[in-house]
Amino acid sequence: MYKFYKHKLYKKYQDELWGHIISKKSFSYNKKSILLNYRDIILRNRLRIKTKFKYFRRGFLKNLNYTLLLFKFFRKNIRVFSFKRRQSLSVPLSLSSKRFKTKRKVFFKTSKIASLLKFNIFYANTVAFNKVFIKHNYCLSSCSNIYTQTKLLYFPIISVNRGLVFYKSKNFLRVNNLQFVIKKKLNLRKQKIFFYSVHIAAPKKKTKKWSLFALKNIYYKKVSLFFGFRKVVDFFKVYNLAGALAKGNSFAVFLMLEGRLENFLMRLNLFPSIYFIKKFIEYGNVFVNNKIINYTSYHLNFNEIVSFNKKYYKKLYFFIKSKLRQRKVIINAPSFVEVDYKLLVAMLIRNPDELALTKPLSFNLYTKFLSVNR
């Protein structure tokens, strides 16, 4: 961590910020010698947080300052509560009066910091109630509201309710933005960033050797995800079924997969993902020859008209336009599919050729369909 702040990038960032302060109109060059001390001590501490955690989510420094303030004021309250428990605190009587009660509620709701004033008012109420209860028992009814208020909003004692002291600050102690605090408190080891580097003397030491088994696993996983199977086992069921019907012709497996309704809709560039299409079909929003089809494994025949629910026409048009603007249309409509984007109607014309077939891998007999495209 100390080495990081000696880095050129940190020094460059520090000089830029310092130059920004000097360039202000309110800055006078006579103060330069005084502000050098400010640059070395205070500014370095602020930059230390900003440079290291500037890639964290929005509002990190705000939440950090908020939690530190909460801790500071809670610590003051604990100190007062423990050492000045039996003494009456110097709080104006007007703050604990009934007239100020309504204003006080609004003030405490809007205030972001659990201030020392809030605790002192409640403490003054308890002291006043104890005096009244001992001397004048007939005043119990008039002070009953104060008693209930102090019991409900009683400041937590450390020995009894240790967890409630930092109740409000728990909302801001999150793992993402205050991870360095937790690591410091628990004395955890720092996570070292691993940079892959090649050994200069013997480069073969760092090279990864791919076995045939590893290539097969990559192949099966890539194909199963491409065609919408979350598990490789589900892909093998279709693969074995098509292999039995086509008598071992592996090309027929992919012809069978392209004929499935979910894969057919994916080639039209109308939907964001194949998993979205699965839910879209299951809810009965796809029609084949004006009949609702609610299962994804439906095999299309030639010249069957596929249409959609009219409720989602605007959303589909909007999705097409957004994809065209972002230039994210990866594949045009294939040659074996005919699509009308105005009417939102499509049909399967013929079986795909080997060139027209959409596939995530290269068909090569030498590697037995195991060479992955990169």
UniProtKB/Swiss-Prot annotation:
Domain S4 RNA-binding: start-end pairs: 259-323
Primary localization class, coarse: mitochondrion
Coiled coil stretches, renumbered: none
A GO term, aspect molecular function: rRNA binding
SUPFAM superfamilies: Alpha-L RNA-binding motif
Compartment annotation: Mitochondrion
One Pfam family it belongs to: S4
Protein name, entry field: Small ribosomal subunit protein uS4m
